[in-house]
Structure formats: structure tokens, C-alpha cells
């Protein structure tokens, strides 16, 4: 899963950098990361954070900034964390990992989520399954 995630993340970030090549140091691309860092799925979340950091290191750009939030494997906490990221001016979020945590994300229409779930049916309109 790590290799797939790193490949996807690097490809996506390179596309962002090409599209936003005029970004200045003061105007970085902000990307949210919603993962479980506590609870039963904490190890998976930690691996995703590690893969994200490796991908950022491989990209070698200071134009990307990752904002990490622990969702506790809880749909309500996921929604709350997504709103917090939105308040920071973030409009693209990687995660959540599990389908159950997508439950309320359609309430935030102007955010796009790149979910790591393998389910593709009945996703909210603002969720892209990788």
C-alpha cells in the first residue's frame, strides 16, 4: 500500500506544482491529511504519514504544506477535522482511509477528498476513491 500511495501522491503533487508553478513562498499549496493516529487503526495511519513524508522528500519542493489531523477512526471526528482544515484555507484533503469515515463528508461540498478506500459505490460527490 505504501508504494502505491507514494506513487499516487508524487504524481498528484507534481501535477499540482505544474499547474501552480507561479506559487510564491508565501502562497504554498496546502493539503490536508486525515488519518487515524489513535485507536485500532493507528498503525495504518502512522504508515500513511510516513509514506506522505517520504513522498514530500522525494518531490523536494517547499511549495507543498501538509496539515495532519487525527480522525480517531470516527465519522464525527472526521467531519470535525475536515471543517478545521477547511477553516485553514485547505480545499484538498487526502483521506480518510476507511469507507465508514466518509459518512458525513458530503456536508462539506467545497472540499475534495482523495480517499484511500477501495470502495467506489455510493461515495459522496466530493470524494474520489484512489
Q: What are the language-model segments listed below?
A:
Residues 40, 44, 48-55, 77-81, ...:
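Stable alpha-helical elements in mature extracytoplasmic
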Amino acid at each position: 500500500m505504501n508504494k502505491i500511495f507514494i506513487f499516487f501522491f508524487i504524481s498528484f503533487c507534481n501535477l499540482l506544482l505544474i499547474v501552480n508553478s507561479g506559487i510564491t513562498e508565501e502562497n504554498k499549496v496546502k493539503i490536508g491529511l486525515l488519518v487515524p493516529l489513535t485507536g485500532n487503526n493507528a498503525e495504518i495511519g502512522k504508515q500513511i504519514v510516513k509514506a506522505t513524508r517520504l513522498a514530500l522528500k522525494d518531490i523536494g519542493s517547499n511549495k507543498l504544506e501538509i496539515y495532519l489531523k487525527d480522525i480517531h477512526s470516527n465519522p464525527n471526528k472526521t467531519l470535525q477535522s475536515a471543517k478545521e482544515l477547511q477553516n485553514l484555507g485547505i480545499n484538498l484533503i487526502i483521506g480518510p482511509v476507511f469507507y465508514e469515515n466518509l459518512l458525513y463528508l458530503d456536508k462539506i461540498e467545497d472540499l475534495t477528498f482523495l480517499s484511500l478506500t477501495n470502495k467506489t459505490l455510493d461515495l459522496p460527490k466530493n470524494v474520489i476513491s484512489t
